[in-house]
Amino acid sequence: MNGDLNSWDKFCNYLWFDKKLNIWLDISKINFTSKEIKNLEDKFKDVFSSIKELENGAISNIDENRQVGHYWLRNPSISPSSKIGEEIRADINSISEFGKQILNGDIKNKNNQQYTDVLWIGIGGSGLGPLLITESLQKCSKGLNFSYIDNVDPFLISEKLEELSEKLSTTLFVVVSKSGGTPEPRIAMEIIKSHCENNSLEWNSNAIAITMKGSKLFKKATSENWLKIFNLQDWVGGRTSITSSVGLLPLALINENISEFIRGASLMDETTRIRDFKNNPAALLSSAWYLTGDGIGKRDMVVLPYRDRLQVFSKYLQQLVMESLGKKFNRNGQVVNQGISVFGNKGSTDQHAYVQQLRDGIDNFFCIFIELLDSPSTNIFDEKENPKEYLSGFLQGTRSALSSENRQSITITLEKLNCFSLGALIALFERAVSFYAELVNINAYDQPGVEAGKKAAANIIEYQQKVSHLLDEGGEYSINDITSLFDNSVSEPIFFILREMCFGNDNYLVKGDWSNPNSLVIQKINS
């Protein structure tokens, strides 16, 4: 068998389908030969063994000396201890019961009013996971209304507070931070808490924490008597937290089926434990990534779900794939600069945008098409003008147009989008990421680059405080004056700090020209 993208035999030979999951996976439009597949099958013997060790509780995040246990969340019986399994089941039951009490009105605010909204404060996976849940699954007029603060953009925070101004008293404030020390959710939390208190609105009795036991956030929520604290286990990373409290609480508050979501993820986990390469969808999917990128991530992943409800999925995968696989070193300490860049939006919108380049421009990508076979139960569509059939036609047409130019793609087909299938889809990509990491000998569960970024940001914040304090004391200062007091290597950061602090601010007198940083002299004139 050759690498022909349009080979019917290849399509039939590599099409995967599972009747319990009702999911299809087609990797036939990836360039590979039967010999290449055979070589990978041999490698997967070790991959399967490594994943088994991870699931059994091996220390997988070496930097933080912790296990990686998101697979246990959907099947507590495989967790390494009965205590962990019992805690997982208790957390699920607690969230389910809490959701029912909120939606039924058994738990109300201090004015005996039923809750109407949720303001979710979390960053990274703590924001993207819940956003994916609500955007994909929430039905009109069902459950609470969700708003998100996933950044410290002052306009975002002020706009959300303005949008909710009439409903803040009936809003649940959910703060997600495993350690409680992540600056972005902490800052947003403090701003909103202060706003509530300054306007005689309740915060403590409306606030919910999702965090580790004993964390800074846990202690704060406990001491201030917040409405509820849900557990976020040490062995759950942010990008794989969607089957933890982080994803289950949104499901409960939009009145969706937690059990079905977990069942879908669990069944996909079980299916991808099969050691038969061609019957393991995560093995096939990760192999396609490996082969199309020559094992070094030479091609970007373009995610195109042909359903609006899955538009957030490309952003979700961007974090899952890039944070997991973007690594400088392999496990042997060698510099490898691994990774797969991910972007995408939705079909058929993208056919009128960057698909032009995908077909006719630089060949540095592969597409992942995601299609759904269901359509809404309604009589508003004419049989001759059914949008579902048009959408399917657009997908198949784009796929065909790409392959005619030898542009590679993968197609995943779901029977329908619901809690069960979304759980399965997420688990499929989680497993594929783990498998790919094993193939290229990197650790998918550490994030030294993220930690380096956090440390650098903390240094800048420290300089911001030093500069502010210096200017408060009075006197005129040039950038050279300031760096000579602190560190001569930070001239550029000091310029950025001064620009953010002083430009357009009447409290500061600025002499010189902003286009010539060395000419600037700044003095605080109003306190």
UniProtKB/Swiss-Prot annotation:
Primary localization class, coarse: cytoplasm
Localization (cell): Cytoplasm
A single Gene Ontology CC term: cytosol
Keyword set, alphabetical order: Cytoplasm, Gluconeogenesis, Glycolysis, Isomerase
GO molecular function: carbohydrate derivative binding; glucose-6-phosphate isomerase activity; monosaccharide binding
UniProt record, GO biological process: gluconeogenesis; glucose 6-phosphate metabolic process; glycolytic process
Residue numbers annotated as active site: 323 (proton donor), 352, 454
UniProt pathway: Carbohydrate biosynthesis; gluconeogenesis; Carbohydrate degradation; glycolysis; D-glyceraldehyde 3-phosphate and glycerone phosphate from D-glucose: step 2/4
First-tier enzyme category under EC: isomerase
Catalytic activity of the protein: alpha-D-glucose 6-phosphate = beta-D-fructose 6-phosphate
Record bears the keyword Isomerase: yes
UniProt-listed SUPFAM superfamilies: SIS domain
InterPro entries, per the entry: G6P_Isomerase, Phosphoglucose_isomerase_CS, SIS_dom_sf, SIS_PGI_1, SIS_PGI_2
Enzyme Commission no: 5.3.1.9
Claim: Cytoplasm is one of the keywords in the record: yes
Function: Catalyzes the reversible isomerization of glucose-6-phosphate to fructose-6-phosphate.
Record-linked NCBIfam families: PRK14096.1
Family: Belongs to the GPI family.
Name used for this protein in its record: Glucose-6-phosphate isomerase
Gene source species: Prochlorococcus marinus (strain AS9601)
Gene from which the chain derives: pgi
